[in-house]
C-alpha cells in the first residue's frame, strides 16, 4: 500500500498546488497535485522518481519540499525564482526501505512551469550530509525534511536560510 506524507502547498494563478511524498515500500518519490478549492485534489504526476542506476546517491529516496515560497502573512504563496529557476530541497538516499541508510539533503531545480508535472533536475551531489566535516551530534545519522526561505532583508546575515530535521 502507498503512504502519503509531507504536503507542501503553494499557489500559481487560480490554482493551489501541492507537492507530496509517496512511499511504496521501496522509498520516497515526490509527486504533484492541483486543486481549485484546497479540498478536491487531482494528481498530476511525479516530480522526482526512483533512478534506474542504483549507484547514484539518491537512487531510492527523493523526498522533495518546494523552496522559496512567498510565505509572507497575507502574501501570494507563490514560488519565487532564483537565477531563473524554481528550487526544491529534498532528502535522498540510495538504500531501499522506509528512511533506511544514510539520508542527505540535496537540491533540485527546474526552469519549466512548476504547476506541470515533469522531472526536476537534481544537483549531482548532496549539499548537506551526516558525514560533513562540521556536522554536529544531533545531525550525524540522517537528515530529513527541509524548508528553504529567502531572507531578502538579510535579517540572518544570509540571503537563504534552511530549516531541517535530522538525527
Task: Place the predicted regions along the sequence by residue.
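Beta-rich carbohydrate-recognition and catalytic domains
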Residues: 1-6, 10-64, 68-141, 150-167
Amino acid at each position: 500500500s502507498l503512504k502519503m506524507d509531507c504536503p507542501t502547498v503553494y499557489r500559481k494563478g487560480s490554482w493551489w498546488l501541492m507537492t507530496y511524498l509517496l512511499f511504496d515500500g521501496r522509498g520516497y518519490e515526490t509527486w504533484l497535485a492541483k486543486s481549485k478549492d484546497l479540498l478536491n485534489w487531482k494528481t498530476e504526476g511525479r516530480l522526482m522518481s526512483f533512478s534506474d542506476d542504483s549507484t547514484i546517491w539518491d537512487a531510492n529516496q527523493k523526498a522533495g519540499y518546494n523552496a522559496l515560497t512567498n510565505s509572507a502573512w497575507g502574501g501570494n504563496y507563490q514560488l519565487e525564482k532564483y537565477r531563473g529557476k524554481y528550487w526544491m530541497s529534498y532528502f535522498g538516499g540510495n538504500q531501499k526501505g522506509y528512511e533506511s541508510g544514510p539520508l542527505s539533503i540535496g537540491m533540485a531545480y527546474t526552469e519549466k512551469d512548476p504547476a506541470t508535472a515533469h522531472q526536476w533536475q537534481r544537483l549531482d551531489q548532496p549539499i548537506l550530509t551526516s558525514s560533513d566535516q562540521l556536522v554536529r551530534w544531533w545531525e550525524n545519522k540522517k537528515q530529513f525534511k527541509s524548508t528553504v526561505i529567502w531572507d531578502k532583508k538579510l535579517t540572518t546575515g544570509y540571503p537563504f536560510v534552511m530549516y531541517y530535521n535530522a538525527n
